[in-house]
Amino acid sequence: MAIHVKNNIHWVGQRDWEVRDFHGTEYKTLQGSSYNSYLIREEKTVLIDTVDHKFSRDFVQNLMAEVDLNTIDYIVINHAEEDHAGALSELMARIPNTPIYCTHNAIDSITGHHHHPEWHFHTVKTGDTLDIGNGKQLIFIETPMLHWPDSMMTYMTEDAVLFSNDAFGQHYCDEHLFNDEVDQTELFEQCQRYFANILTPFSRLVTAKIHEVLGFNLPLSMVATSHGVVWRDDPAQIIHLYLKWADSYQEDRITLFYDTMSNNTRMMADAIAQGINDVDPGVAVKIYNVARHDKNEILTQVFRSKGVLVGSSTMNNVMMPKVAAMLEEITGLRFQNKKASAFGSYGWNGGAVDRIQTRLMDAGFETTLALKTKWRPDGSALEICREHGREIARQWALHPLDDTPARRVISPVKQTTVAPQSASAPAESACGCSEVAAPQSTAQPAAQSGNGCMQCSVCQWIYDPALGEPMQDVTPGTMWSDVPDSFLCPECGLGKDVFNPIR
């Protein structure tokens, strides 16, 4: 059933109440989702995007009930992923000569998915327009890597509607279409979850692209997303939230997550959290077992936090697999402006904590205060864990704290191994079980330093002045300041503004 959006614009998309996995099984869509397609009927009839491929037949049948397919003059594909363009094959089988407007990269993606290079593609770039009659135009805005290289937005003049693609959306299903009609708590939780899990790696691009769009000084009455609600009540609010979230976002919050074999690491997590609360009762603290909790919720909490503590029992001298997988996710999301610490229990060798600490450093976190406990923590060891939490609270505080401790105990920063391990057999410490690792360096290791190298913040490709970039006529010995402004990253195709110096 079509839903009226504004004037001659109607929603002709598909709700998906049952979907629980997205991007394979990487994103849990616990609130379902929607695939938003829009039909514009001015002097020219335009279809913007389709729906997920599994709804192809339903989509085309519903569209035929709304409009004669042969009257569709143009199809605009903002993004070629299958949840946006999945019904193209079913639709184009009926109207094969209808022109498709998309970016150059989208042609490759669409052809790769649907295998119809004969379709009539029209490549568009930022600033290109399409006259649709009645004094109205569509303006196209390329948004590469938000979140695919082929992505773009489409703006409709006069009606002042921005068809924003994945940006500003959320995997959220509701019978109501507009943001002012749905549960606001649910809505904004899903917006933040979406940003944290999908768009965080591209935060710098989000900021740059939003400012580029705002620089056009176009009026805005609605933001029509590809998933979730249409923003009609104060549509600028979600844009301002994106700018906030993209700017090294953090709250006064600490997240702990762990996996454990015998509950020993869980006991450590509980005690550390108690210690944090002793010193800073105002900070929000959440604890998650990665084997039992929703992964995307944990990642959202890490995104919100000023710091994260990651724990694991040692198994085969490495961390437990679910913790390793979570750290791989975190590395890819490239969170900014966050501190981190590793902790964990072990029996004869505590290799997991060392590996976690290294992975956190590699992921760009400022690391401090790793903590190891041997065997099952007793009362003395748990008190060391609490003091570890107190020291974390002091070091990570965003505001002045009361310097008077709740209880006077030995600081874990000064603690060393109580009883050394024998080379032949594990020795138990004097307190029964605990050891505190030496504080780790807070400096992130750099691949190169002091040589003028620049690293792409999106794909991590490194420009080395000693090598230059011959494919773009940048000769060896060319310093970054002398590289032409037209330079593009050879890996992701983005410009100089996404590069940062390697220090």
From Swiss-Prot:
The membrane-spanning stretches of this chain are none
The Gene Ontology CC terms held by the record are: cytoplasm
Keywords attached to this Swiss-Prot or TrEMBL record, sorted alphabetically, are: Cytoplasm, Electron transport, Flavoprotein, FMN, Iron, Metal-binding, Oxidoreductase, Transport
* Cofactor binding note from Swiss-Prot or TrEMBL: Binds 3 Fe cations per monomer. Binds 1 FMN per monomer.
Name the segments for region: Zinc metallo-hydrolase. 30-210
Q: Which residues does the UniProt record annotate as the domain Rubredoxin-like?
A: 451-502
The question of whether Cytoplasm is a record keyword is answered with yes
Q: What PROSITE patterns does this protein's entry cite?
A: FLAVODOXIN_LIKE (PS50902), RUBREDOXIN_LIKE (PS50903)
Pfam families (alphabetical): Flavodoxin_1, ODP, Rubredoxin
User: So where does Fe cation 3 get bound?
Assistant: C456, C459, C489, C492
Q: Where does Fe cation 1 bind?
A: H79, E81, H147, D166
Q: Which cofactor does the UniProt annotation name?
A: Fe cation; FMN
Domain of life according to the entry: Bacteria
What protein family is recorded? In the N-terminal section; belongs to the zinc metallo-hydrolase group 3 family.
Q: What does this protein do?
A: Anaerobic nitric oxide reductase; uses NADH to detoxify nitric oxide (NO), protecting several 4Fe-4S NO-sensitive enzymes. Has at least 2 reductase partners, only one of which (NorW, flavorubredoxin reductase) has been identified. NO probably binds to the di-iron center; electrons enter from the NorW at rubredoxin and are transferred sequentially to the FMN center and the di-iron center. Also able to function as an aerobic oxygen reductase.
How it assembles, according to the record, is: Homotetramer.
Protein name per UniProt: Anaerobic nitric oxide reductase flavorubredoxin
Its lineage reads: Bacteria, Pseudomonadati, Pseudomonadota, Gammaproteobacteria, Enterobacterales
